[in-house]
Amino acid sequence: MDNVAIKGSLVAIVTPMHENGELDLERFQSLIDFHVTEGTDGIVVVGTTGESPTVDFEEHHLLIKTAVEQAAGRVPVIAGTGANSTREAIDLSIYAKNAGADASLSVVPYYNKPTQEGLYQHFRAVAEAVDIPQILYNVPGRTVADIANDTVLRLAQIPNIVGIKDATGDIGRGFDLLCRAPEDFAIYSGDDASALALLLLGGHGVISVTANVAPKLMHEMCIAAFAGDLAAARAANRKLLRLHLDLFIEANPIPVKWAVAQMGLIGEGLRLPLTPLSNRYHQTLREAMSEAGIDLAISV
């Protein structure tokens, strides 16, 4: 694991927006400072949780640039650069490299349902076009296409394809990769509820929704798992369990943006087709936050 450069709790950071849906860059900068202070080990910007499908190309560039500048080398910045167009994924990855991002996160192409060979050729083309460490991102619940472990292992032979975010929640699948992939190929959980199990099997970190709300506790859980301190890791995860589950009570990032807004860190702005968290879930999420020891800045 020492050969993996980026490890630990990597927040899949939300994108703050004003009520009219415009980007709130001031809050975005403050949010990055908050994560640095709270011990987050890396910032993943403009991913699923960052509402990448509804930001335009210029905004996508601006968010990457702002994240890199605000982080200022204090923590690694991983730029979401995935697209279902290989050309677009290449363009975004080139921008991320030139902006100074430490790595890119490239989602499995969605909607057009490529074959396994198509997935291999897509990611290889991106890797050959731009020399930035590339992390694959498999989330078949959203993309429909599902990259098989054998395809991942083929891609792991390409020097600048350095890891995968596996959001399937399938621990057996993750362990299979840990057993067969090169030692310097990072396996990140993309499923908060099962992340601890993968970490204890040798996983390298978690790209986390929960870390938006409980960054310090997520960091502590990872550190304990890496140290083999099962009791401490389980104790941290026990406090986080309801958050892991209830942050998906409606489609991500609806609940997490509401929760971060209750902490006073951002406003509640979303872009259609996402809509605000249903009122009936507010108390459920407040209770989950309370179990994790999170203070609410906004009173009921």
UniProtKB/Swiss-Prot annotation:
First-level EC class: lyase
Pathway assigned in UniProt: Amino-acid biosynthesis; L-lysine biosynthesis via DAP pathway; (S)-tetrahydrodipicolinate from L-aspartate: step 3/4
GO terms under cellular component: cytosol
EC number: 4.3.3.7
Predominant place of localization: cytoplasm
Pfam families named in the record: DHDPS (PF00701)
Active-site residue numbers: 137 (proton donor/acceptor), 165 (schiff-base intermediate with substrate)
SMART domains linked to this entry: DHDPS (SM01130)
Cytoplasm keyword on record: yes
Cell compartments where the protein resides: Cytoplasm
Catalytic activity field: L-aspartate 4-semialdehyde + pyruvate = (2S,4S)-4-hydroxy-2,3,4,5-tetrahydrodipicolinate + H2O + H(+)
Gene Ontology annotations of biological process type: diaminopimelate biosynthetic process; lysine biosynthetic process via diaminopimelate
Positions of pyruvate binding: 49, 207
Annotated keywords: Amino-acid biosynthesis, Cytoplasm, Diaminopimelate biosynthesis, Lyase, Lysine biosynthesis, Schiff base
Binding partners and assembly: Homotetramer; dimer of dimers.
Protein name: 4-hydroxy-tetrahydrodipicolinate synthase
Species the sequence originates in: Nitrosospira multiformis (strain ATCC 25196 / NCIMB 11849 / C 71)
